[in-house]
């Protein structure tokens, strides 16, 4: 699968693999946010990491914000079922119920990489709870317990859903507003892998629409 990566994807692959291959080098970024519009190959990247690392005998934990999204991942599951986080609690009281001697705690200790797919639908409180439980399980105070973590998603597409929540509440609750998000090194994919000849102009227009930078039309 690595041979199929384009130039931008290969750059992302190498940046994420660096701290995995050099676990004692704390100067390397260990937390990443992978941004890219729909069709840029984010899902392909996640499964490439999974296949490569599992082929090396390493453990990878791959989770998503919804069960439908999780089906696109290699051995995927939802983040709330894996990390025992109640997604309906949207306050600072959100916690993980993982026990230190449980099977998932053992997997976390062994994991070379943790991937959270469609993290744009994850609450800031869930991210905070994840950061805390990783530190607790790994028994250190380094960001995310020194684990290599990749969050990914496109804020142009899917945001979290809050029952009866209005726009202000949704914006306040996204992971970008979590203090623990500052540890993430930004990675970007730009090339649309789904476009065919003659469709790039429309793909560019969709990105402009998603960025909110289309010219305003006065009626």
Q: Which residues are covered by each model-predicted region?
A:
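Conserved ATP-binding/catalytic motifs of P-loop helicase motor domains
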Residues: 1-219
């Amino acid at each position: 699968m690595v041979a199929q990566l384009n130039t931008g994807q290969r750059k992302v692959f190498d940046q994420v693999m660096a701290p995995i291959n050099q676990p004692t080098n704390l100067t390397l970024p260990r937390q990443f946010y992978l941004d890219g519009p729909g069709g840029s190959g984010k899902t392909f990247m996640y499964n490439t990491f999974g296949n490569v690392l599992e082929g090396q005998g390493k453990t990878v934990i791959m989770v998503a914000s919804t069960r439908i999204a999780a089906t696109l991942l290699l051995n995927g599951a939802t983040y709330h079922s894996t990390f025992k986080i109640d997604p309906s609690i949207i306050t600072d009281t959100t916690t993980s119920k993982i026990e230190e001697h449980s099977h998932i705690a053992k997997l976390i200790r062994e994991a070379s990489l943790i991937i959270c797919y469609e993290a744009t639908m994850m609450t800031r409180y869930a991210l905070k709870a994840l950061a805390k439980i990783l530190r607790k399980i790994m028994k250190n105070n380094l960001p995310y317990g020194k684990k290599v973590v990749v969050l990914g998603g496109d804020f142009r597409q899917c945001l979290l859903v809050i029952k009866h929540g209005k726009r202000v509440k949704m914006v306040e609750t996204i992971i970008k507003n979590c203090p623990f998000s500052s540890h993430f090194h930004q990675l970007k994919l730009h090339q649309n892998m789904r476009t065919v000849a003659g469709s790039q102009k429309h793909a560019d227009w969709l990105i402009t629409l998603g960025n909110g930078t289309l010219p305003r039309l006065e009626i």
